[in-house]
């Protein structure tokens, strides 16, 4: 039993303790720097969006339709919260917003802006801006944790946020909202890396809650990405239990 505990304590899945608080790429200063960097990168890549948030849409195809639906979800959240996907489309059919891509999560996130301004264009643009910004930051957060490198996180974040595939979806808000699956994966990584101990610490369970919250949020923001993140999480779980945890690898030796 002692050998087993020693193995788990020193297994690859157990994070090592480092005192990096004084380094530029570590701690709260690094978080602030990364957030600022990806905010500026998003301004550059989406220009002139930031100076036309109130009255600009990328095109006249999907964006006006999505913006209108976001407004309906925000109104329903106040006046008809049990029927968030209800609108006049295809009356008398109910929940017609849900016939297309799932927008429930985005509508809830954008609701406070709509309540304050009544401007669905502003809601659409802020959510669109945030999707690029947080896509970069979420990938930076994950890669910086896995590699310990601030620069590697920046590079990975730029690729994830502004790759031709993602940037090409600029006018399709549900498909730009890919950031939550990476936050979800980050929470899962931190949860599985928590030291094996009894009883579990509160922080351990907070990481599990972090994972579940963002997993569900991603599914509510884009139904397509619910399948993407299920595959992503499944692949990571297979990798972790086969190679990092030592639970399977030890048996092979």
Where in this protein do the model-derived segments appear?
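Transmembrane helix-loop junctions in multipass membrane proteins, especially transporters and channels
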Residues: 50-54, 119, 194-198, 241-252
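Membrane-interfacial entry segments at the cytosolic side of transmembrane helices
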Residues: 28-29, 202-206, 246-253
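Membrane-interface coil-to-helix junctions
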Residues: 41-135, 163-178
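Membrane-embedded helix bundles of polyisoprenyl
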Residues: 38, 127-195, 203-245
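Generic alpha-helical secondary structure signal
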Residues: 35, 100-111, 153, 157, ...
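Membrane-interface starts of transmembrane alpha-helices
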Residues: 29-33, 115, 119-127, 148-156
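Start-transfer (signal-anchor) and selected internal transmembrane alpha helices
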Residues: 1-47
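Basic polycationic patches enriched in arginine
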Residues: 4, 198-200
């Amino acid at each position: 039993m002692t050998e087993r505990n020693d193995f788990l304590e020193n297994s690859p899945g157990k994070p090592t303790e480092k005192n990096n608080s004084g380094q530029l790429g570590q701690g709260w200063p690094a978080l602030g720097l990364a957030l600022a960097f990806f905010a500026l990168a998003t301004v550059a890549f989406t220009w002139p969006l930031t100076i036309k948030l109130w009255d600009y849409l990328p095109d006249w195809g999907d964006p006006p339709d999505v913006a209108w639906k976001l407004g309906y979800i925000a109104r329903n959240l106040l006046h008809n919260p049990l029927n968030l996907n209800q609108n006049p489309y295809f009356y008398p059919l109910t929940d017609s917003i849900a016939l297309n891509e799932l927008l429930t999560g985005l509508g809830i996130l954008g609701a406070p802006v709509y309540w304050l301004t009544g401007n669905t264009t502003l809601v659409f643009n802020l959510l669109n801006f945030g999707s690029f910004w947080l896509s970069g930051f979420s990938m930076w957060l994950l890669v910086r944790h896995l590699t310990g490198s601030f620069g590697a996180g920046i590079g990975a974040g730029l690729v994830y946020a502004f790759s031709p595939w993602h940037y090409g979806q600029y006018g399709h808000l549900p498909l730009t909202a890919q950031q939550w699956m990476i936050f979800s994966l980050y929470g899962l990584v931190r949860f599985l890396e928590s030291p094996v101990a009894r009883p579990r610490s509160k922080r351990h369970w907070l990481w599990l809650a972090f994972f579940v919250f963002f997993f569900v949020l991603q599914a509510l923001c884009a139904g397509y990405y619910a399948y993407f993140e299920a595959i992503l999480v499944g692949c990571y779980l297979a990798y972790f239990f086969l190679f990092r945890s030592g639970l399977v690898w030890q048996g092979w030796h």
